[in-house]
């Protein structure tokens, strides 16, 4: 068989009672239960670790469960965590609504303001958590510089690398300690399965693995198999996504109905040089403000015909969304304002369709303004 084997099993048979005891005690290698390990899932984990340059990777049921595992494994009641303001809405909810219940203190410095990160540190700061590029504004942080600050303060740096994937950025090589992925997005690449990944060094990963085996947000073997298929085309897909996204961003920047385009590949982007330095491509996500506020943004979205109105991204199909009322809709207006997410903002995750067809669909949106 040329493809990887798919092991759809919950448990494993042992040769003898002594064999079972030895495996459960960790005295001999081998699978004991698919909540712990599964051959298909293990293959996926090993390939992600190789791509990210990590000592170990562990797969989870979703990107959010990867963040849950990271924080619950490495932080305790009384610890302090710094999270960038520019993160996914559910990530903010997880920190604000749930982690704080366990006595974990959380503050939100601006992503790219290194001085603010250093000033926000406390003696009990345990973890820095960032998305770079961020969702949905494609804001960046100098990962190497932020890692130096975190380590000087005795903290770890975790980077959500979902938008770039290891095909375009490898945060561990820039000094980060842990990398997070929603494998649901570009690792899958076709909107088929849901999963997450935590990758890092041995001492941190031992704690994460222990939590996941106990708590059980386990990746299904079938989804791991889908992700293995996705990894085979990851680099070429990310190159194609990036090329089309840059061309679309440049085109949108010239349109009179657009106030501002957020895409680090643009020469006009204030962090363009940083993106060139720490990424090998600019990714697929292009966000922009239209003139006219929420009503205009909704008219633009509703006028499109080819793209899919959905908050998921990473698909071969282009998706379009209104962050203020969907992915970040649970945030307060004040929190959205601090994150730079206004009512006129539209996020487009550029797929692999013909670029001229995509521009024609965006032109329909512009005509509705």
Placement of each model-derived feature along the sequence:
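Conserved N-terminal alpha-helix of the aminotransferase class I/II PLP-enzyme fold
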Residues: 14-68, 90-97
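PLP-dependent enzyme catalytic core of the Aspartate aminotransferase-like
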Residues: 96-97, 105-106, 119, 237, ...
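A common structural junction motif
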Residues: 216-217, 304-312, 365-369
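Conserved C-terminal alpha-helix-loop-beta "cap" of PLP-dependent enzymes
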Residues: 258-346, 350
């Amino acid at each position: 068989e040329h493809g990887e084997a798919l092991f759809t099993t919950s448990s494993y048979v042992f040769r003898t009672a002594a064999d079972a005891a030895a495996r459960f005690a960790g005295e001999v290698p081998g699978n004991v239960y698919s909540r712990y390990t599964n051959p298909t899932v293990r293959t996926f984990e090993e390939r992600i670790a190789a791509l990210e340059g990590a000592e170990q990777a562990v797969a989870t049921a979703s990107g959010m469960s990867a963040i849950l595992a990271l924080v619950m494994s490495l932080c305790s009641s009384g610890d302090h965590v710094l999270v960038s303001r520019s993160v996914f809405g559910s990530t903010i909810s997880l920190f604000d609504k749930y982690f704080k219940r366990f006595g974990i203190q959380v503050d939100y410095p601006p992503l790219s303001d290194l001085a603010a990160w250093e000033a926000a540190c406390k003696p009990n700061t345990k973890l820095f958590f960032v998305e770079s590029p961020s969702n949905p504004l494609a804001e960046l942080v100098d990962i190497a510089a932020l890692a130096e600050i975190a380590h000087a303060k005795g903290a770890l740096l975790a980077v959500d690398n979902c938008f770039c994937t290891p095909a375009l950025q490898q945060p561990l090589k820039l000094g980060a300690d842990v990398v997070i992925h929603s494998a649901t997005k570009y690792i899958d690449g076709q909107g088929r399965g849901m999963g997450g990944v935590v990758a890092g060094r041995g001492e941190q990963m031992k704690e994460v693995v222990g939590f996941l085996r106990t708590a059980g947000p386990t990746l299904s073997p079938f989804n791991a198999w889908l992700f293995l298929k996705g990894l085979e085309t990851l680099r070429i897909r990310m190159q194609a996504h990036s090329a089309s996204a840059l061309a679309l961003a440049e085109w949108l920047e010239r349109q009179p109905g657009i106030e501002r385009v957020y895409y680090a590949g643009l020469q006009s982007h204030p962090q363009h040089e940083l993106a060139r330095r720490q990424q090998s491509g600019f990714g697929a996500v292009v966000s922009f403000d239209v003139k006219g506020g929420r009503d205009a943004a909704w008219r633009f979205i509703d006028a499109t015909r080819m793209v899919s109105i959905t908050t998921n991204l990473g698909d071969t199909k282009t998706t379009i969304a209104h962050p203020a009322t969907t992915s970040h809709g649970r945030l307060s207006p004040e929190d959205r304002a601090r994150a730079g997410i206004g009512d006129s903002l539209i996020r487009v995750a550029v797929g692999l369709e013909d670029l001229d067809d995509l521009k024609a669909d965006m032109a329909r949106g512009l005509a509705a303004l």
